[in-house]
UniProtKB/Swiss-Prot annotation:
Signal peptide: none annotated. ATP binds at residues 65-72. This is Protein RecA. GO terms for cellular component: cytosol. The lineage of its organism: Bacteria, Pseudomonadati, Pseudomonadota, Gammaproteobacteria, Pseudomonadales. Keywords: ATP-binding, Cytoplasm, DNA damage, DNA recombination, DNA repair, DNA-binding, Nucleotide-binding, SOS response. It holds the Pfam family RecA_C. InterPro entries: AAA+_ATPase (IPR003593), DNA_recomb/repair_RecA (IPR013765), DNA_recomb/repair_RecA_CS (IPR020584), P-loop_NTPase (IPR027417), RecA-like_C (IPR049261), RecA-like_N (IPR049428), RecA_ATP-bd (IPR020588), RecA_C_sf (IPR023400). It comes from the Bacteria. GO terms for biological process: DNA recombination; DNA repair; SOS response.
Length: 352
């Protein structure tokens, strides 16, 4: 850059700082690039698929899938992991369907969990914005976007047409709260439902509710599906679950993780660690027997997972070994993610 351009740039930067305050414009090289802090999902495989060891703080995340696929269970697992780190969490229950007893079984400290059951979509999003701006909340879950019903629709007649109201509400709210979420370093998770588009001949007819705004503003989008049943004899005790990272602004997307959700217990982490340990050479498998560090830990996956549950120190060591091996490339990705600007999107006029 020649001297005239340097002087012009210095003058412009000086004027910007006087008008908007120090730090309004900064050089990326003046400060060390820090890794994006993440909150574990409670699933080791999903943490690895996300590339940074969990869901990114200071960002919006969307989790969507069919009914009974594990959406709420996954978000409650995130809250449980965050609370273990001393985080303060809130649950905006627009569906009015949160079960405190089930949340407690998944490890959530329900006594410390902030819960809101708003009457309208505007109220839910306003409460979310106020919680974010308090700078005191680390994780907020909104369950769900489909239940964020605009006030005009609630007060109207049952058969009235309200085209695009929910989409406009989401677009306006996300424009308002995105910057606040980044400043507060708060993770906001929106749970969403699936609808079918009519008349689609090619491609998937599936879409999510609430318009297109959330798709743009979300840094991470997770598609969660139930792929089968976990059985003990003839009794169904859980679900085989697959989560695909459909969008990821902080690491490479389109990775996926498969794990089990056990009814009344949540994500089967110890079973995941056995599978990943065998896959990456930390756990040896010979026939039906599993061994770790040369010592047999159990016959069959269930007994080996029980050994890890009974020996948390060994489980923590194995988990750290797996994370250290599979998340070594994450810092470069995280640094690159910090350079991404937040995109402004056009308001979605229709709910598609």
């Amino acid at each position: 850059m020649d001297d005239n351009k340097k002087k012009a740039l210095a003058a412009a930067l000086g004027q910007i700082e006087r008008q908007f305050g120090k730090g309004a414009v900064m050089r990326m090289g003046d400060h060390d690039r820090q890794a994006i802090p993440a909150i574990s999902t409670g699933s080791l495989g999903l943490d690895i698929a996300l590339g940074i060891g969990g869901l990114p703080k200071g960002r919006i995340v969307e989790i969507y899938g069919p009914e009974s696929s594990g959406k709420t269970t996954l978000t409650l697992s995130v809250i449980a992991q965050a609370q273990k780190m001393g985080a303060t969490c809130a649950f905006v229950d627009a569906e009015h369907a949160l079960d405190p007893e089930y949340a407690g079984k998944l490890g959530v400290n329900v006594d410390d969990l902030l819960v809101s059951q708003p009457d309208t979509g505007e109220q839910a999003l306003e409460i979310t914005d106020m919680l974010v701006r308090s700078n005191a909340i680390d994780v907020i879950v909104v369950d769900s976007v489909a239940a964020l019903v605009p006030k005009a629709e609630i007060e109207g007649e049952m058969g009235d047409m309200h085209v695009g109201l929910q989409a406009r509400l989401m677009s306006q709210a996300l424009r308002k709260i995105t910057g606040n979420i980044k400043n507060a370093n708060c993770l906001v998770i929106f749970i969403n439902q699936i609808r079918m588009k009519i008349g689609v001949m090619f491609g998937s007819p599936e879409t999510t509710t609430g318009g297109n705004a959330l798709k743009f503003y979300a840094s991470v989008r997770l598609d969660i599906r139930r792929t089968g049943a976990v059985k003990e004899g003839d009794e169904v005790v859980g679900s085989e679950t697959r989560v695909k990272v459909v969008k990821n602004k902080v690491a490479p997307p389109f990775r996926q993780a498969e794990f089990q959700i056990l009814y009344g217990k949540g994500i089967y982490l110890n079973g995941e660690m056995i599978d990943l340990g065998v896959l990456h050479g930390f756990v040896e498998k010979s026939g039906a027997w599993y061994a770790y560090n040369g010592s047999k830990i159990g016959q069959g996956k269930a007994n080996s997972a029980k050994f890890l549950a009974d020996n948390p120190d060994i489980a923590a060591t194995l988990e750290k070994q797996i994370r250290d091996k599979l998340l070594t490339a994450a810092p470069d990705v995280k640094a690159a993610a910090n350079r991404e600007p937040v995109a402004e999107v056009e308001e979605a006029d229709t709910d598609i």
